Regions:
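A short aromatic-anchored loop/beta-hairpin motif
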Residues: 60, 79-89
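Short acidic/polar active-site loop segments enriched in Thr and Asp
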Residues: 81, 168-169, 262, 330
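Active-site-proximal loop/short-helix segments
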Residues: 129-134, 168-188, 219-235, 267
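A substrate-binding/cap region within the structured catalytic cores of diverse enzymes
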Residues: 139-167, 172-206, 210, 395-398
Length: 400
């Protein structure tokens, strides 16, 4: 009997030891993988010229449903980090596939760094998918549904559908708390007027997108749900103190960070009691002190469209670009078109030469951008034509 107990104890000891060794091996494998990634990114950055480095910091919109010579040149020579597509770029499903394939084809012979092909496909009234694709529900509809599993399923289904068309990054979900009924710019784009509901539904939607290997960029930090003004046209101000922001507006974003969100879009909103001179996109107090230091966020930070009225009607583009990068933002999103993007790139290059922006600051953002592209194994692989009936059936079977 005693011998049996000793044998049992010794067996348990060796099993624990084996488990510890396996655990240490897993940790070692993870560490070696991380080290390899870090070295590859460092080598990539060290091999890049100025145009390649600066270009990665910009996502550009463009006009038309095909690749113009100007856009081709922007991808080939300016090495932009990504493009963003809107409804005006999309005619139908076949045209969209041809367009994203063309973008990848041009980029693949450019610098070897895969390109972000992005969209802000939220569902509901913010829909960029071709008209021959079944509609996705709004965030408000998902919030009314109240089922976290449903939110995850919608996010996952959406991710798989947009990936079929060549997109690898989606500026969604909206994590704003719609606490102001007079706010029409957000409204049904939010999951609800309660921070806990927004947190629960938003995080599941985000995780659903990520599970389909699509990058999810949550928005619009620090929270656009209680503003009177629409930042598309004018500069909104929020009078809330930090305590209120921590209790409501910041809640979904903090939880998204805890859940490992890969991207956060910062909005053009002035938090008067934190930085009364600068919108959040241009505020070091918001981007660096709160997002980076207080919330320990290490992912990629994107601007809302820098051409929106909140910025264009109040700031010179040069000042806005320099202050945005100095604040700690990684990627400037510019929807206006190729010429505007080229101007932004020249502003950054000129600021580097004059010392208004440091090379180290650019390298910090570049490291985060490349790390994200590495994490999702982005590639410029062309896609085959889609089966429209199969896609619509997939949507209906999963979320209708």
């Amino acid at each position: 009997m005693k011998n049996g107990r000793w044998i049992l104890l010794i067996s348990i000891f060796f099993l624990l030891l084996l488990g510890l060794c396996i655990g240490q091996k897993d940790k070692l494998s993870f560490w070696l993988s991380s080290l390899k990634e870090k070295r590859e990114i460092e080598n990539q950055i060290n091999s890049m010229n100025l145009d390649e480095k600066v270009g990665q910091l910009v996502i550009s919109g463009f006009k038309g449903e095909t690749i113009s010579e100007e856009l081709k040149e922007l991808i080939e020579k300016s090495h932009i980090g990504g493009v963003i597509l809107f409804s005006s770029n999309i005619k139908d499903s076949n045209q969209l596939i041809e367009l994203t394939n063309s973008i990848k084809d041009i980029n693949s012979i450019s610098d070897g760094i895969p390109i972000f092909i992005s969209v802000d496909q939220e569902g509901g009234r913010v829909s960029r998918l071709p008209k021959d694709i079944e509609k996705f529900p709004s965030a408000a509809h998902i919030g009314d549904h109240g089922d976290e599993n449903y939110s995850y399923k919608v996010g996952n289904t959406l991710g798989q559908v947009i990936k079929t068309f060549g997109f690898n990054l989606n500026f969604a979900p909206v994590l704003d708390v719609a606490s102001n009924p007079e706010n029409k710019v957000i409204g049904d784009r939010a999951f609800g007027d309660n921070e806990d509901l927004v947190r629960r539904m938003g995080l599941q939607f985000m995780n659903g997108l990520r599970s389909s290997n699509v990058i999810s960029v949550v928005k619009h930090f620090p929270g656009h749900g209680d503003t009177k003004e629409d930042s598309h046209y004018e500069l909104p101000y929020l009078n809330h103190h930090k305590e209120r922001l921590d209790a409501i507006e910041f809640v979904p974003f903090k939880k998204a960070i805890d859940d490992g969100t890969d991207g956060i879009m910062v909005s053009h909103i002035v938090l008067k009691n934190i930085d009364n001179k600068n919108p959040a996109t241009m505020s070091k107090a918001v981007v660096t002190d709160i997002l980076r230091k207080e919330f320990n966020y290490e992912g990629v930070i994107f601007t809302d469209d820098i051409n929106m009225g909140a910025i264009a009607n109040n700031y010179l583009l040069r000042d806005a670009v320099i202050k945005t990068i100095d604040a700690g933002v990684d990627v400037i999103v510019s929807s206006k078109g190729v010429e505007d993007t080229k101007f932004i790139i020249e502003i950054i290059k000129d600021a580097l030469k004059k010392g208004d922006i440091s090379e180290e600051r650019i390298k910090e953002s570049l490291n985060r951008i490349l790390k994200l592209k590495y994490k999702y194994s982005l590639e410029d692989k062309k896609l085959s034509n889609i089966n429209l009936d199969k896609i619509n059936r997939f949507i209906n079977d999963n979320i209708k």
